[in-house]
């Protein structure tokens, strides 16, 4: 528990802080293992204290453009001695390159933006488990073997190492470690010793790789001691880690012993045994594995340090191997060249350290690790929530297929630390979670949540905020925040103590939550009227917001919860001023701000003298740079096929304060989060078109580009730079009309700004045709050659504008990339959603004149099915819909705190009725608020102008257009690829695959009695290969169709049965149709 004044500082602080610790402490700690290597006649020294980091050669933006990796170079001074003589002087060598984290908390690897997810794993330490016949104490280290101490009913004590069946008596084990009988008896009370320490009669002891019955008596103890020393007392093979040592000290010692020892000590085993005796006497409950006090979070830095540790071990073994090879080679040379004089030994700096191999290993971790994923940057919310995910999967975590329901369930310790709502759906449910809003992670890796101090019923906000972990909740009682307004003395309140919830008096409360939505994640926290929805629908609402496309005409929501500004700030979609100053330049590429001038302490000193220059460089009060330059990202496609653009919102000579937004990203407007549009909605059934969550929309949404999104497609090609120039990019393409190449440059690449409509030439490429040598000689003499057109064409259905072209040189070839931007208007089959899990697919687009309209003649834009609300229990959409209606009429915006019912009963309803009444009075539209039917009015049918029989709910809802677009989903097989082995069409849209004529389709044709058509569909038109090849000849020559053969699919079935050992074949009267 540490006293803090602020609840949060930065939502991305977990990643950035962890990576900084890795660079400052983690790398140095790992390099200490190879600081001095002495082997044979060699002595290799790495001067770690003089370690340096070299800045990246390219900026993060240029790495994205050029498909490079954004990394830093580690430089270490290295010195090599041979037989006491220096053969390689102390010089800086390039040790390796590691990917460097950007300001956004991401890594750029091969031009792709990646993120490493936090991992939640079991904490190192002691775990007690009670069984019917015995008591088990398991010691889990950070790295090394697991140890289990078993105590049975007979009071016999054994030790097991890892998963080995044979156990070792504890007394024997302690003797081998070097503890005498006297020391064991002194550490335990005499009574405890006689009662609790019975010596086993077991004589045969087995330790991995050692069988004591096979050893002589003299070497017995020495060999075992060496084995145990290497397993548990050697820091290279065994490491408890800071957390493991902290937990052991806290459980078995009154004061912290061995704080700097990361290995097991013999005294630790005695302490654990003492602890087990106490537990047996007191009957303490066994440890709950799912409790957060038994779990730690490994962030980017810790995961990279674990990888770096493995790399260091490999380096050590390879250096020793190379030394041995060098010594063997030298001995062989000395045998043959005895008469020659001794030559100086020359060793290159790359002989022992190959920086390229080390860099590739680290790069492989970033690209192949299951916790490393491509950043989901569809919108600012999806980007931020992806960075705050926490996974129990991965290396050292839980296996997805073996995870039980107990592991997936919500635990009481999650309160205020892990969101109980937001999780992945499907197989990863309960395994991939999301961190709560205001949490932080302490130095041991435990999650802490903020609380206010309560003393004798008085809430002490002035004392600041206390961060408490699950471990520290043992002896305190915590109350929720909803008692703040109605906090009365002499009354019982709901409290949490030792992961249990019950009612207790106000005097017993020690801490209280800081806010009502403290337990929620960032995604669920921006859903207004959250408390009126079912938890499953809130989960859907959170996931739908992450799938929302940024629209062409952005619009913020009229109802917010206050977290939207934080999301824009910490997702780095906006640029924030680091210091106050005046704007002296502002454009689409950069913003320059002149800093506030400060008087120098050394104003009258002549700066031309070198002595003073060196002194002044160290003085912090002298400011070298008076201007701060903020580069706006060049238009660049992200992982989600959307342009990442930033636009300046400041002008020249504007005064800027520190922390002010100076440039906005794609998903923000005036600092507000923009994910959808406020659209007029009506809840009624309309001719069955909105049956089962289907959505009917007005033609206005399509015509006025209200739900139009912008997408980017990349087309690329490679040109090999060969001496013979077999391929060439040119505008002069044979047999192509001029109108088809009018948009190409002289280089043969399409111009920026050209319109694309269907299959058009993007890159004009010609290739030399392969001809016989005689004809080729004539072409060489005439300096001409036969040319073939292999130009790159745009996709068939792509309609857009060329916005960018790039050419990259990669070794002996050129990579040409063309970016085409297209508008995608709303259409039938597209998916829309609200913020309350109310999702659906568009079934019908209706003309404006046919849509139902309000009493003032305003046509409704979207018709939703009212039956979807009571069954799904997401009433929050109605609250939002009605409050939005009053917000538009009153021209106001609202911030609604989740769980605001604690202030007084029916708070949400009272607020909505109040605002609807105000809007009725202001606009003088009586139908806006009817006290008998609040939130409802009579709508009119657009087709005949008659009013509907009943009053209908209507209002403005914040509608999101999701990434599931019908145009991208539809796939039809025309002429596809076939598998060469099974002769069946390949699977999937990406391979242009298809399917056979299905079983239900066969039934349909059977129903119509079309026997000959069915025969053709299943044979000649499908996979009767022999007749398929003959059909064109027969049609051209006027011959009749040949009899159908057995299709390949049936032959495949026979082969499958034969592979099972069944002797099945196809026979006719004359011959076998199909042989093995």
Curated annotation (Swiss-Prot):
Predominantly, its location class is plastid
Q: Which SUPFAM superfamilies would you find in this protein's record?
A: beta and beta-prime subunits of DNA dependent RNA-polymerase
What PANTHER family does its record include?
Answer: DNA-DIRECTED RNA POLYMERASE I SUBUNIT 2
Q: Which reaction does it catalyse?
A: RNA(n) + a ribonucleoside 5'-triphosphate = RNA(n+1) + diphosphate
Q: Name one GO biological process term.
A: DNA-templated transcription
Broad class of enzyme this protein falls into: transferase
Which N-terminal residues, if any, form the signal peptide?
none
Q: GO terms for CC?
A: DNA-directed RNA polymerase complex; mitochondrion; plastid
Q: What is its EC number?
A: 2.7.7.6
Per UniProt, subunit arrangement is: In plastids the minimal PEP RNA polymerase catalytic core is composed of four subunits: alpha, beta, beta', and beta''. When a (nuclear-encoded) sigma factor is associated with the core the holoenzyme is formed, which can initiate transcription.
Q: From the Swiss-Prot or TrEMBL record, what is one GO molecular function term?
A: DNA binding
Q: Which gene encodes it?
A: rpoB
Protein's recorded name: DNA-directed RNA polymerase subunit beta
Query: What keywords are assigned to this protein?
Result: DNA-directed RNA polymerase, Nucleotidyltransferase, Plastid, Transcription, Transferase
**Hey, which family's this protein in?**
Belongs to the RNA polymerase beta chain family.
HAMAP family given for it? RNApol_bact_RpoB (MF_01321)
Compartmental location: Plastid
Q: What organism is recorded for this protein?
A: Euglena longa (Euglenophycean alga)
Specify whether Transferase is a keyword of the entry: yes
């Amino acid at each position: 528990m540490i006293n803090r004044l602020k609840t949060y500082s930065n939502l991305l602080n977990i990643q950035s802080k962890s990576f900084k610790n890795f660079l400052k402490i983690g790398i140095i700690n790992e390099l200490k293992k190879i600081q001095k290597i002495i082997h044979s006649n060699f002595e290799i020294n790495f001067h770690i204290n003089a370690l340096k980091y070299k800045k990246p050669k390219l900026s993060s933006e240029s790495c994205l453009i050029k498909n490079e990796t954004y990394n830093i170079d580690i430089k270490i001074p290295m010195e090599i001695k041979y037989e006491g003589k220096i053969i390689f002087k102390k010089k800086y060598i390039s040790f390796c390159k590691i990917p460097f984290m950007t300001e956004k908390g991401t890594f750029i690897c091969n031009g792709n933006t990646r993120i490493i997810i936090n991992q939640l794993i079991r904490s190192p330490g002691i775990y007690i488990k009670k069984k019917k016949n015995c008591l088990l104490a398991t010691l889990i280290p950070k790295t090394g073997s697991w140890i289990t101490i078993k105590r049975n009913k007979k009071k016999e004590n054994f030790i097991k190492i890892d998963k080995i069946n044979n156990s070792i008596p504890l007394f024997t084990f302690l003797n081998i470690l070097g503890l005498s009988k006297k020391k064991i008896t002194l550490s335990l009370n005499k009574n405890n010793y006689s009662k609790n320490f019975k010596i086993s009669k077991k004589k045969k002891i087995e330790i991995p790789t050692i069988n004591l019955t096979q050893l002589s008596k003299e070497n017995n103890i020495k060999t075992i001691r060496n084995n145990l020393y290497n397993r548990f007392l050697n820091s290279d093979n065994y490491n408890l880690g800071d957390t493991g040592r902290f937990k052991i000290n806290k459980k078995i010692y009154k004061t912290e012993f061995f704080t700097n020892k990361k290995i097991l000590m013999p005294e630790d085993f005695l302490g654990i045994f003492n602890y087990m005796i106490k537990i047996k006497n007191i009957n303490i409950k066994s440890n709950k594995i799912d409790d957060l006090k038994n779990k730690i979070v490994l962030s980017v830095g810790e995961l990279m340090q674990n990888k770096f540790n493995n790399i260091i071990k490999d380096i050590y073994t390879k250096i020793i191997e190379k030394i041995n090879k060098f010594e063997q080679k030298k001995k062989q040379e000395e045998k043959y060249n005895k008469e020659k004089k001794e030559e100086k030994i020359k060793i290159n700096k790359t002989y022992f350290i190959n920086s390229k191999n080390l860099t590739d290993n680290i790069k492989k971790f970033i690209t192949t690790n299951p916790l490393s994923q491509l950043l989901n940057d569809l919108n600012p919310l999806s980007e931020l929530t992806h960075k705050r995910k926490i996974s129990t999967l991965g290396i050292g975590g839980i296996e997805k297929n073996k995870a039980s329901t107990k592991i997936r369930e919500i635990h009481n310790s999650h309160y205020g630390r892990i969101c109980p709502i937001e999780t992945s759906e499907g197989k990863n449910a309960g395994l991939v979670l999301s961190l709560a809003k205001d949490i932080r992670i302490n130095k041991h890796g435990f999650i802490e949540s903020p609380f206010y101090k309560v003393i004798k019923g008085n809430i002490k906000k002035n004392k600041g905020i206390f961060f408490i972990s699950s471990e520290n909740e043992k002896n305190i009682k915590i109350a929720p925040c909803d008692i703040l307004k109605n906090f009365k003395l002499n009354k019982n309140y709901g409290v949490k103590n030792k992961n249990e919830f019950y009612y207790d008096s106000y005097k017993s409360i020690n801490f209280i939550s800081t806010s009502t939505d403290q337990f929620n994640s960032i995604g669920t926290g921006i859903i207004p009227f959250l408390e009126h929805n079912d938890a499953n629908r809130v989960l859907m609402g959170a996931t739908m917001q992450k799938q929302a496309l940024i629209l062409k005409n952005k619009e913020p929501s009229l109802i917010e919860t206050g977290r939207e500004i934080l999301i824009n700030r910490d997702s780095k979609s906006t640029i924030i001023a680091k210091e106050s100053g005046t704007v002296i330049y502002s454009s689409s590429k950069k913003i320059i701000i002149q800093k506030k001038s400060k008087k120098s302490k050394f104003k009258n000193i002549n700066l031309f003298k070198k002595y003073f220059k060196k002194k002044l460089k160290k003085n912090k009060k002298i400011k070298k740079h008076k201007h701060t330059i903020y580069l706006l990202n060049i238009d660049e496609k992200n992982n989600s096929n959307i342009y990442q653009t930033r636009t300046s919102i400041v002008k020249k000579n504007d005064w800027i304060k520190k922390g002010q937004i100076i440039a906005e990203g794609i998903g923000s407007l005036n600092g507000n989060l923009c994910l959808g549009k406020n659209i007029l909605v009506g809840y009624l059934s309309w001719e069955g078109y909105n049956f089962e969550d289907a959505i009917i929309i007005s033609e206005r949404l399509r015509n006025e580009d209200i739900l139009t999104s912008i997408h980017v497609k990349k087309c690329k090609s490679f040109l090999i730079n060969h001496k013979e120039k077999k391929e060439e990019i040119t505008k002069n393409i044979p047999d192509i009309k001029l109108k088809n190449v009018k948009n190409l440059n002289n280089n043969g690449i399409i111009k920026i700004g050209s319109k694309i409509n269907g299959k058009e030439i993007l890159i004009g490429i010609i290739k030399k045709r392969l001809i016989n040598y005689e004809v080729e000689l004539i072409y060489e003499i005439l300096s001409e050659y036969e040319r073939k057109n292999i130009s790159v064409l745009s996709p068939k259905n792509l309609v857009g504008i060329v916005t960018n072209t790039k050419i990259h040189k990669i070794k002996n070839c050129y990579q040409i990339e063309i970016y085409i931007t297209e508008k995608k208007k709303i259409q039938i089959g597209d998916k829309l959603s609200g913020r309350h899990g109310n999702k659906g697919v568009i079934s019908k687009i209706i003309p404006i004149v046919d849509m139902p309209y309000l009493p003032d003649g305003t046509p409704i834009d979207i018709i939703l099915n009212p039956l979807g609300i009571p069954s799904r229990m997401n009433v929050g959409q109605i609250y939002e819909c009605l409050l939005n209606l009053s917000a538009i009429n009153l021209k106001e915006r609202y911030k609604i705190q989740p769980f605001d019912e604690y202030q007084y009963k029916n708070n949400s309803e009272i607020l909505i009725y109040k605002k609807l009444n105000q809007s009725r009075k202001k606009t003088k539209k009586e139908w806006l608020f009817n006290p008998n039917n609040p939130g409802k009015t009579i709508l009119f049918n657009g087709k005949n102008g008659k009013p509907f029989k009943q009053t209908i709910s209507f209002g403005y809802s914040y509608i999101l257009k999701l990434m599931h677009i019908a145009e991208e989903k539809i796939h039809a097989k025309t002429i596809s690829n076939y598998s060469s082995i099974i002769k069946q069409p390949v699977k999937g849209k990406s391979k242009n695959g298809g399917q056979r004529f299905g079983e239900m389709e066969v039934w349909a044709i059977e129903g119509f009695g079309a026997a000959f058509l069915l025969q053709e569909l299943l044979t000649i038109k499908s996979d009767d290969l022999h007749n398929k090849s003959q059909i064109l000849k027969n049609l051209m020559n006027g011959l009749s169709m040949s009899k159908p053969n057995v299709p390949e699919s049936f032959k495949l079935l026979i082969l499958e049965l034969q592979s099972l050992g069944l002797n099945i074949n196809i026979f006719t009267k004359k011959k076998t149709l199909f042989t093995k």
